[in-house]
Amino acid sequence: MGAGEKTAAGMPRIGMGTAVQGPKPDPIRRAVLRAIEIGYRHFDTAAHYETEAPIGEAAAEAVRSGAVASRDELFITSKLWCSDAHRDRVVPALRQSLRNLQMEYVDLYLVHWPVSMKPGRFKAPFTAEDFVPFDMRAVWEAMEECHRLGLAKAIGVANFSCKKLETLLSFATIPPTVNQVEVNPVWQQRKLREFCRGKGIQLCAYSPLGAKGTHWGSDAVMDAGVLQEIAASRGKSVAQVCLRWVYEQGDCLIVKSFDEARMRENLEVDGWELTEEERLRIAEIPQRKINLGKRYVSEHGPYKSLEELWDGEI
């Protein structure tokens, strides 16, 4: 099983995602506990998901039951929401996340988007008045303070373009360990992966299956004919082919299913490989970004177009 393999930074290659529509604390607590029992060790949450508390409860329960010896066996990622992306709000925001998790530290703390909003703005839809300019240096200096205080073992970003990473690296004292972005066979991120590899930044893939069923997701990945043909010829599911492809790129992946059979299937990425011919066929899939982040773009806000948000990398 692939859940145990780790990156150089000690992050398990496969993590369980917990972004859900609407709070569902009890089902999440039960699903996370079951995931720990079947081998998951990496759990991905965020202040914005409102799933930190049930993850913390499941982790505590897993320690009590002996499913893990201690919290240290788990790798917990959380994220700074846009309304707290201000110099004086970053450390307090992480402390609140830690209270929610009932933990003393997170293994990884990410800037969720390169976006700042007025304090208190949590739920879409957002208006132009909600956005304020993103002071990357101020936010990152506060993220570095989280690391120095021992509240976050590692720090990183999410949804950053090559250009934004270049800017961040120009002044960061502690460079980002991870950039968590959308990666799947329909949005392969070749340019960003090459850039991150050259800078020692680990790419972590969210929505490796295209996030079908979410408000912004798409069927484009699971319905791709090439992937369906490869899956049929190999006796695998389309999901397994997608996850194997992402895994072979060297990325970490965040998978989300609360169904036990699927949770097990999503761990089965090793023990087989795509052939060179299959990889070439996947490389030819027409590319289009699924999670555009349109809600962060406003004609009177800091990002007036998707081109500006992604620096043309779409």
From Swiss-Prot:
GO BP term, example: siderophore biosynthetic process
Annotated segments matching region Disordered: 1-21
Catalytic-site annotation from UniProt: 49 (proton donor)
Pathway terms, separated by semicolons: Siderophore biosynthesis
SUPFAM superfamilies (alphabetical): NAD(P)-linked oxidoreductase (SSF51430)
Sequence positions that bind substrate: 112
One GO MF term: aldose reductase (NADPH) activity
Role played: Catalyzes the reduction of a 3''-keto intermediate during the biosynthesis of 2'-deoxymugineic acid (DMA) from L-Met. Involved in the formation of phytosiderophores (MAs) belonging to the mugineic acid family and required to acquire iron.
Name of this protein: Deoxymugineic acid synthase 1-D
Lineage: Eukaryota, Viridiplantae, Streptophyta, Embryophyta, Tracheophyta
Gene: DMAS1-D
